[in-house]
Amino acid sequence: MPSAKPLFCLATLAGAALAAPAPSRATDFNKRSTCTFTDAATASESKTSCSDIVLKDITVPAGETLNLKDLNDGTTVTFEGTTTWEYEEWDGPLLRISGKDITVTQSSDAVLNGNGAKWWDGEGTNGGKTKPKFFYAHDLDDSKISGLYIKNTPVQAISVESDNLVIEDVTIDNSDGDSEGGHNTDGFDISESTYITITGATVKNQDDCVAINSGENIYFSGGTCSGGHGLSIGSVGGRDDNTVKNVTFIDSTVSDSENGVRIKTVYDATGTVEDITYSNIQLSGISDYGIVIEQDYENGDPTGTPSNGVTISDVTLEDITGSVDSDAVEIYILCGDGSCTDWTMSGIDITGGETSSDCENVPSGASCSQ
């Protein structure tokens, strides 16, 4: 009679296999090791294979995005060596990272080189060559970007559309664009975001150091801005989201720039700018305006005629000091009828320029003279 033992063993093994729990995604993910990628395609294809991604000396082909979208929760991305992008006219972005609880950082000598000079023609996004935006930090939630050194972006450097994102000690160096035709090289463009903290940033460029177009609970501290258009809110109005609320710029310097502090809203649009603080801002070498708040932007340019559809309320301007050029205006405020309310100004000491006689509808608590 055949032995039943093998049958028993098979049944036992089969039962054990059925009883064993399936490995969870979290367990599987935690077991994965560091992966080092040296080409963009493999990095994009295999980005969910590791908990720690190292990008080493990658050259991204022309017209392609280094795509790290939809990373696994908790992933760390580290740039090593030089990351470069080859030239092609297109909209970009050159780099995209998204996910939750993501850390983006680099080794001490790494450079993210956008090769912007190949696109620069003095036109920026207003014409000439089609230029790609550099880094989309969109849907990069509960995350941190730390210590990146970004050089020569074709146009705007970092576009932020995220919630609860910390950006610390990032350098954006587009200073070569001063002599080579850089234009619209914004440092940080923030839209439709909440709880964004930027500390210790250094921005050398030819447009806004920071531009907040919409969003709430945004904090910028310890920044060093030079060559551009200053610390800006707006233009607000005419977008899907037209609210900017609870924004603080503090303990920062703006030098060799067109403006120091700026808020601008769109003519005949609607929206809200509320609970805004500029505190301890040091200015030097400002060519146009030390402080400028105006409600007259149309098709990207000021018209001199304000409207009141966007309200600007609860604004604190304190301890803004320094110098502007002799033909610059120290303070310029152009509000619509009744749309600017509840402002306070204190500790304003801006010297070297002119006092504007063209201010309109200046709210109680503010002044165009010192």
Swiss-Prot record:
Pfam families named in the record: Glyco_hydro_28 (PF00295)
PbH1 repeat start-end pairs: 162-192, 193-214, 215-235, 244-265, 273-295, 307-352
Listed name of the protein: Probable endopolygalacturonase A
Source superkingdom: Eukaryota
Glycan attachment points: N246
SUPFAM superfamilies, per the entry: Pectin lyase-like
Subcellular locations according to the entry: Secreted
Reactions it catalyzes: (1,4-alpha-D-galacturonosyl)n+m + H2O = (1,4-alpha-D-galacturonosyl)n + (1,4-alpha-D-galacturonosyl)m
Gene3D superfamilies: Single-stranded right-handed beta-helix, Pectin lyase-like
